[in-house]
Amino acid sequence: MNVVNTLQIIVANMLIYSTPLIFTSIGGVFSERGGIVNVGLEGIMTIGAFSSVVFNLTTAGMFGSMTPWLSILFGALIGALFSSLHAVATVNLRADHIVSGTVLNLMAPALGVFLLQVFYQQGQININEQIGYWNVPLLSNIPVIGKIFFTQTSLPGFLAIVVAILAWYVLFKTRFGLRLRSVGENPQAADTLGINVYAYRWAGVLLSGVLGGVGGAIYAQAISGNFSVSTIAGQGFISLAAMIFGKWNPIGAMLSSLLFGLFTSLAVVGGQIPGIKEIPSSFLQMAPYVFTIIVLALFLGKAIAPKADGVNYIKSK
């Protein structure tokens, strides 16, 4: 295997495995920039994956090759609805953010497996219509670069990069983003200026639900091709680490997700790559999770979160 083919395998798989992380970590950015800690990203991804797979199986005969894409939209919708539980608990009822997010993480896989038994009488379901690999028109014909970056790659991956750029623009260059960040930094001052703190915090959590649902749906539609209790398997927690490593910035979260995606891709395709295939597969499979622990240990104390992140707001009378 030559260098170009090796790089093509690594880059293509890195983009595929980082895509769910990019969407979900950006969702976490919106939630926490608004002041709501969302450790429930794992649960949101799980419910997004479950709902997208059910939609895929139900409508595949109707929509054909468009089914996976519509399934992603359905996963986004269900992710938003599921995240509203977190919004009610933290924004309206002023519950502890960590406890509320943990409830989502515990509820989602249990609910998914229960409904699988109810609907299909089994603990795992597979889909027939998946998102396949894609050659970028024109760009894939560029010598060397086209082979590495634009051949047999992931269309959702490129969409995720576009979403990251748009999210950065919304967060830092629009009135909505300025107000969302203000309620995450100093909600009292924002309220004094007439900004509805509760509404913007709700918006941040719902955006995290939409993007987390998309992340889970893409994982099911493009990577696993199924849903079971172990489908997501820590991807939400890795997304949370990517958000922290990226310093609550959409671009930083995207770059961090690409790095985590690289480690995950090496765990999957390492057996095909000279110099890596000699490493025991068990070490490669644990690498993404070990790297997550290292990142959190090194950067959690140093990364500066929004000042009011995790602080419940009580409107003054």
From Swiss-Prot:
Q: Does the keyword Transmembrane apply?
A: yes
Q: Where in the cell is it found?
A: Cell membrane
The alphabetical list of record keywords is: Cell membrane, Membrane, Transmembrane, Transmembrane helix, Transport
Q: How does it sit in the membrane?
A: Multi-pass membrane protein
Q: What induces it?
A: Constitutively expressed.
CC terms in the record's Gene Ontology section: plasma membrane
Chief location bin: membrane
Where are its TM segments located?
9-29, 35-55, 62-82, 98-118, 132-151, 155-172, 203-223, 225-245, 251-271, 286-306
Single GO term (MF): transmembrane transporter activity
Q: Domain of life, per the record?
A: Bacteria
The subunit structure is: The complex is composed of two ATP-binding proteins (NupA), two transmembrane proteins (NupB and NupC) and a solute-binding protein (BmpA).
Q: Which family does it belong to?
A: Belongs to the binding-protein-dependent transport system permease family.
Q: What does this protein do?
A: Part of an ABC transporter complex involved in the uptake of all common nucleosides. Responsible for the translocation of the substrate across the membrane.
What PANTHER family has UniProt attached to this entry?
A: GUANOSINE ABC TRANSPORTER PERMEASE PROTEIN NUPQ (PTHR43370:SF1), SUGAR ABC TRANSPORTER INTEGRAL MEMBRANE PROTEIN-RELATED (PTHR43370)
- Kindly provide the name given to this protein in its UniProt entry: Nucleoside ABC transporter permease protein NupC
**Native species of this protein?**
Lactococcus lactis subsp. cremoris (strain MG1363)
